[in-house]
Amino acid sequence: MSGISPSSSGLLPMPGAPSSSWSAYKARVAALLGHHDTKVVVAFWLFGLINNVLYVIILSAAQDLVGSLPKGVVLLADVVPSFLTKLIAPYFIHRIPYRTRILIFIALSAAGMLMVALTPATQSVAIKLVGVILASISAGGGELSFLGLTHFYGPMSLAGWGSGTGAAGLVGAGLYVMFTDWWGLSVRSSLLISACFPAIMFLSFFVILPLGPLREGTRKDYDAIPDLEDEDVNHMDQGTASSALLAPGPSVASTAYSARNNQESLTVRDRMNKVKKLFVPYMMPLLLVYVAEYTINQGVAPTLLFPLEESPFDEFRAFYPFYGFLYQLGVFISRSSTPWIRIHHLYLPSMLQIANLVLLTLHAMYFFLPSVYVVFIIVFWEGLLGGGVYVNCFAEIMENVPAEDREFSLGATTVSDSGGISIAGLLSIVMETKLCNYQVAHGRDWCQRISAQGQ
């Protein structure tokens, strides 16, 4: 039995122990919340949550925004601008300070959600889609910026970001179901509430996140200081390097910014060559898993309907948001798992996701799965696979890519998820229509009984 006391170990005292008291608990929790590492994890968790939650809410609201139009239309408006942002921005965004980027992202996302919420149902869907596009640009720029920022804060920041993005899916889909189905709020009211969320990003960056590593970037001299020589960094194994970044002190921050300073001198051709090296090990499996899962979500899921008397729902429009909730629950669990479970072979879960797409497409056509609850399990499994590939892809980059290339690589690889979703959006527009027509032709007209909810 160790003789280390709770107070010296940082653990909370056991209830009933002599050292336990309400004041002791409060003091210990306050110390934990004030710790540098805790602030980093909380800040990046909130970055991931807020940057992605509006995207999820928009997709959850797709059926109510466009009614009988293919949901892939909303998916494309929600993803293509983000994809183009991620495709172009890595070559110049390093010139924009992180503080300025945060303010831009907040303004774009809030304006986009207000435009979607305040556009009357009687007006053109195109106006709503413009608002979706603004939010998409913000999300794309935010993702590549925050993932690049994890380079300076280490593995725990990536764990916080991954868990936050997973929580965004769960919170976004869950909130929309709660607002519209449980509380009976209109779509407009639900989206207006959502437009307030970007303010949390401001608090996360300017209040919670320790800005010491960023302030180091204002120095003109980025040479590593004597207690951490360049030679030491170059010969340090990746696991040790990652651990050293766990709680970046001045020397680690200086080294990180030295690498960034070297990267800023690279030409566009140099950066494109670096992207080519990322494609097969990291970008391709991420692309494949996103093509498969978002084709399921937007092209197949709207047609995965059952007779209402055999389901827990009162109307057909309730299937789609609940599928989204289960999917996002799986994503949240798997994106929060990297401290305990690591996936090094990224192609295996990608292939399993493609198998899910084939299975659910066949069921949409031939209706052979015995219960909607079986579909619930498959959709949850789909979320586990998708979230696992996402967070483990960036964890592999953080471990295996040299420090001088890491910030750029983390940001550049984000183009794969948006690229995959864009491809899925195009496929979904065709697949949803074809599957619905096939079902109607074979005596199942449930997909035609869904209309947009009044705002």
Curated annotation (Swiss-Prot):
<feature type="transmembrane region" description="Helical">
    <location>
        <begin position="159"/>
        <end position="179"/>
    </location>
</feature>
<protein>
    <recommendedName>
        <fullName>Protein BTN1</fullName>
    </recommendedName>
</protein>
<dbReference type="InterPro" id="IPR018460">
    <property type="entry name" value="Battenin_disease_Cln3_subgr"/>
</dbReference>
<keyword id="KW-0926">Vacuole</keyword>
<dbReference type="GO" id="GO:0005774">
    <property type="term" value="C:vacuolar membrane"/>
</dbReference>
<keyword id="KW-0029">Amino-acid transport</keyword>
<dbReference type="InterPro" id="IPR036259">
    <property type="entry name" value="MFS_trans_sf"/>
</dbReference>
<feature type="transmembrane region" description="Helical">
    <location>
        <begin position="191"/>
        <end position="211"/>
    </location>
</feature>
<feature type="transmembrane region" description="Helical">
    <location>
        <begin position="73"/>
        <end position="93"/>
    </location>
</feature>
<dbReference type="GO" id="GO:0006865">
    <property type="term" value="P:amino acid transport"/>
</dbReference>
<feature type="transmembrane region" description="Helical">
    <location>
        <begin position="313"/>
        <end position="333"/>
    </location>
</feature>
<feature type="transmembrane region" description="Helical">
    <location>
        <begin position="346"/>
        <end position="366"/>
    </location>
</feature>
<comment type="similarity">
    <text>Belongs to the battenin family.</text>
</comment>
<feature type="transmembrane region" description="Helical">
    <location>
        <begin position="367"/>
        <end position="387"/>
    </location>
</feature>
<dbReference type="Pfam" id="PF02487">
    <property type="entry name" value="CLN3"/>
</dbReference>
<dbReference type="GO" id="GO:0051453">
    <property type="term" value="P:regulation of intracellular pH"/>
</dbReference>
<keyword id="KW-0812">Transmembrane</keyword>
<keyword id="KW-0472">Membrane</keyword>
<feature type="transmembrane region" description="Helical">
    <location>
        <begin position="102"/>
        <end position="122"/>
    </location>
</feature>
<feature type="transmembrane region" description="Helical">
    <location>
        <begin position="129"/>
        <end position="149"/>
    </location>
</feature>
<dbReference type="InterPro" id="IPR003492">
    <property type="entry name" value="Battenin_disease_Cln3"/>
</dbReference>
<keyword id="KW-1133">Transmembrane helix</keyword>
<keyword id="KW-0813">Transport</keyword>
<feature type="transmembrane region" description="Helical">
    <location>
        <begin position="286"/>
        <end position="306"/>
    </location>
</feature>
<feature type="transmembrane region" description="Helical">
    <location>
        <begin position="40"/>
        <end position="60"/>
    </location>
</feature>
<comment type="function">
    <text>Involved in vacuolar transport and vacuole pH homeostasis. Also required for cytokinesis.</text>
</comment>
